[in-house]
From Swiss-Prot:
Residues reported in the UniProt entry to bind ATP: 9, 57, 85, 91, 102, 112
Family listed: Belongs to the NDK family.
Active site: 115 (pros-phosphohistidine intermediate)
Main location: cytoplasm
Assembly: Homotetramer.
Designated name of the protein: Nucleoside diphosphate kinase
The species this protein was found in: Campylobacter fetus subsp. fetus (strain 82-40)
Length: 137
């Protein structure tokens, strides 16, 4: 059983669509193994997204991710990483397939509603960033 990390970003939390997004995960075979709502600090956002530190959008990404609360979850299921990415849709909501989370709830390429791990290896690292093993069940 695979696990992946999902973050419901500040734009989606502010719009009040957290429940609708969680329903997408659960109705497509992904179980929530852990979840918490939190306010990312600038330091934590920089550390979490440090892989993008050299990219031009890094500062805006950190600013956006600290602009309001997020909901961080461990999703579990068969092919969880791929399934989550399919449910999310393309990074740019204008390119996201109809019926995906980003097509339905995202505002822009920056305020794109959700983050999801892009590989099993990254999922393990990202999950460990937010959750202790005892919090995942």
């Amino acid at each position: 059983m695979e696990q992946t990390l999902s973050i419901i970003k500040p734009d989606a939390v502010k719009k009040g669509v957290v429940g609708k997004i969680i329903d997408r995960f659960e109705s497509n075979g992904l179980r929530i193994a852990a979840a918490k709502k939190l306010q990312l600090s600038v330091e934590d956002a920089k550390k979490f997204y440090e892989v993008h530190a050299a990219r031009p959008f890094y500062g805006e990404l950190v600013e956006f991710m600290t602009s309001g609360p997020v909901v961080v979850m461990v999703l579990e299921g068969d092919n969880a990483v791929v399934k989550n990415r399919e449910l999310m849709g393309a990074t740019n909501p204008k390119e996201a397939a109809a019926g995906t989370i980003r097509a339905d709830f995202a505002e822009s390429i920056d305020a794109n509603a959700v983050h999801g791990s892009d590989s099993l290896e990254n999922a393990k690292t990202e999950i460990a960033f937010f959750f202790a093993k005892r919090e995942i069940c």
